[in-house]
UniProtKB/Swiss-Prot annotation:
The gene is aroB'. This is 3-dehydroquinate synthase. It comes from Halobacterium salinarum (strain ATCC 700922 / JCM 11081 / NRC-1) (Halobacterium halobium). Catalyzes the oxidative deamination and cyclization of 2-amino-3,7-dideoxy-D-threo-hept-6-ulosonic acid (ADH) to yield 3-dehydroquinate (DHQ), which is fed into the canonical shikimic pathway of aromatic amino acid biosynthesis. InterPro entries: DHQ_synth (IPR002812). Its EC number is 1.4.1.24. The lineage of its organism: Archaea, Methanobacteriati, Methanobacteriota, Stenosarchaea group, Halobacteria.
Length: 387
């Protein structure tokens, strides 16, 4: 599941200058959506590139003032000044609901429901059956029946939970272990907005179970075309990438964060191996190192198996002398990879990072093991022999 952060920035927030400051802070932090009134859509487009959701309105003047496609939101939201926010009483029979009718007729694709009491929970469920996105906001965070909505709505809609802080966002993402798909943040604090985006990123990160494999062979393998993956991010001392010749077993190769007497640290770089090798990607797939180019995403992993995404700035390919490293897993499987013969290339071991030039037969390495083969980088349930 890919989580997202929506930022509330309609006229309830304040005047346009106040809303503009909030939206700008959101753009700088990396929010995914901005929720505004219909009249502000074009203004938001001028500030930057972001998905824009707008409360739908029948105000003809607003529609006439809109200019071209810049004034068209990515999602129309029903519920403000209606039944969804309590301005209009809920009908006894939901078939007579104006908000639900707007969703059914395609006049809106997103529902906004403020949970004022228990009567609004079934209304939110009814909206979720016809809405692409369902925003639920509570007057009091503690009474939002988020667990019930997550359990009953399932995958019928993208469930967006209203929050006022990063701490509330974290709770929303973790509720029932499944969590909300997204949060709608109502805050002017740029730091709180950034923290909420960080919570989103953490919720999306895969946590891998790293294993060990024992070196059975390490030998010079001649020259090959070696790939340095230069990312657009600074990598930490315990971070690197998972690479290898066999997709079923990938080696943990550290980033070049350590100083050397011979070369300066390159904390954005992983000297990943030869062009044929696989590197793991954030979606759980793999790419050949030779395929990587600027703008691609790779998965970065740390010593505890925590992962994050990094964008590739460039892939630098040069002919270099290589080692062939072969290792055996606990179940007797054999995996291997080619790594440059240089003291600056380090791999993860139970005793810490070790230069490939210092490795010996019998040493243990940290690896990531997975079942199945790969076809165009996607896992498939098929017997594939790699040797």
């Amino acid at each position: 599941m890919t989580r997202s952060v929506w930022l509330k920035a309609d006229d309830e927030v304040g005047d346009w200058e106040t809303r503009k400051r909030r939206i700008t802070a959101g753009l700088e932090a990396g929010v995914d959506w901005v929720l505004v009134d219909r009249a502000d859509v074009a203004r938001v487009r001028e500030l930057g590139s972001v998905n824009v959701a707008a409360f739908s309105t029948d105000d003809a003047n607003v529609i006439e003032d809109a200019e071209g496609t810049d004034a068209d939101p990515d999602a129309y939201v029903a519920g403000k000044d209606g039944e969804g926010d309590g301005t209009v009483d809920l009908p006894a029979d939901f078939s007579g609901s104006a908000d639900l009718s707007a969703l059914r007729r395609g006049h809106a694709d997103t529902a906004y429901v403020r949970i004022r009491d228990e009567e609004y929970e079934p209304f939110a469920q009814a909206a979720a059956e016809v809405a692409d996105h369902t925003i639920v906001v509570g007057d009091d965070w503690t009474i939002i029946p988020l667990e019930n909505l997550i359990a009953r709505i399932g995958e019928e809609t993208t469930l967006v939970a209203g929050v006022e802080s990063a701490a509330e966002a974290e709770t929303a993402f973790e509720t029932l272990d499944i969590g909300a798909d997204a949060v709608l943040l109502d805050s002017d604090d740029p730091d709180e907005i950034r923290r909420t985006v960080s919570v989103r990123d953490a919720a999306d990160r895969e946590h891998l179970a790293l294993s060990t494999a024992t070196i059975t062979t390490i030998e010079e393998a001649g020259s090959a075309d070696r790939v340095c993956v230069d990312t657009g991010s600074l990598l930490a001392d315990d971070e690197g990438m998972l690479v290898g010749s066999m997709s079923r077993g990938l080696f943990f190769v550290h980033a070049e964060t350590a100083q050397s007497p011979y070369v300066a640290a390159r904390p954005f770089r992983v000297n990943a191996g030869a062009v044929h090798a696989y590197v793991r990607t954030p979606d759980g797939g793999t790419k050949y190192l030779a395929e990587l180019g600027s703008g691609d995403e790779v998965q970065v992993v740390d010593g505890d198996g925590r992962t994050r995404s990094a964008v590739v700035g460039r892939a630098k390919i040069e002919k270099r002398p290589m080692f062939r490293v072969e290792a055996e897993t606990d179940d007797g499987d054999r995996i291997e990879t080619l790594l440059q013969n240089a003291e600056t290339i380090k791999v993860a071991t139970p005793n810490g990072r070790t230069a490939v030039t210092d490795l010996s037969v019998g040493d243990d390495l940290h690896v990531f093991l997975q079942d199945g083969g790969r076809h165009f980088g996607e896992a498939i349930d098929e017997r594939i022999i790699e040797q």
